[in-house]
Structures are given as C-alpha cells and as structure tokens.
Amino acid sequence: MDRLGLDEVWWLVSPGNPLKDQAVDMAPYAARMASARTMARHSRIKVSDFELRAGTRYTVDTLRQILRRWPRHRFIWLMGEDTVAQFHQWKDWRTLARLLPIAVLSRPGYDDDARAARATGWLRWFVRPARQAVNWTEWSAPAISFLRLPPDRTSATRLRALNPDWHRRFSSPRRGIVHP
C-alpha cells in the first residue's frame, strides 16, 4: 500500500470465478468472506461483497459499476503476477486495462510467466517504471507497473491442498459482511 501511496485497499471477494470450477476450486462464499475479513483485520484493507450485491460476474463489469458509483475516487487495480498469466482469458481484459491503471504485485515463481503472458505483450506499450508507482494517480489508463515486493512464499493453492476443509472454521453464521 505504501509503495502506491494508497489510502486503503478494497478486497473484492468474488462470488464466483468464471475461470474456475466452483465446486472443486472454490470454497463457499461465506467462508471466503470470513477468511478475508480475518486476514484484513486491523489494516487499511476493506473486505467487500460489492460484486455479490451488484450481481456482476466479470471484473470489467464490476469495475464499471464501481467507477460509476464513486466517480470522484481514484482506483488502481491490484493483481498478482500469477493472475497476469491468464489475464487474456478475462472478459474484455483490454477494456478493463483502459478503465484504470494496474499494479502487478510480484509472486515467487511467476515472474517469467507474467512477462511472457499474452496480455503482457499488449500491455508492454503501457508499462510504467516501478519507481514511479507512487504517482499512479497521474497516469492515464492503460498503464501498468510491475512491483517487486519482499517475497511471500505462501501459496494459497498449497495451503488448500494441505487442509482441504480449511473453510469450515470460517463457516460460522455469526460473521458479517463489510460494505464499502
């Protein structure tokens, strides 16, 4: 957050990922919301169910609604290097890139995949140096910056494989949802 000078981060928990098999690849929505809230506690990260409430299925549609609803706010899309490798499979990914700047956060083991990704081929014309990332509010989209951060070798995929029932501890009906 500091590298980008962000006031806060909105963590949009998706009710469903069109690129994943819901039954196999995703834990129940309520458990993912509760888990995200636990991880974001006491931070400037706001966990949101906006996508569920908006009824959107695709990120580009969600972002259009967010930009309409909060026209005076400045937004930057944060994504991990692991996501860049499949970004070209997202609905209207070029349109998404034209909506707001993108910051790509380093992920151990994904640097080569991210740099070789089909979407990166198109986005290479819009790359901004990481040292200028704090000035992202001055950028016109499309704009993308690849940020090198201290490595976090935690792999959510590996953690889920080690404990397939991890989400059960977050399945309490008492947990609420935060609405930005």
Regions flagged by a language model, labelled:
Residues 1-180:
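Nucleotidyltransferase catalytic core that binds NTPs
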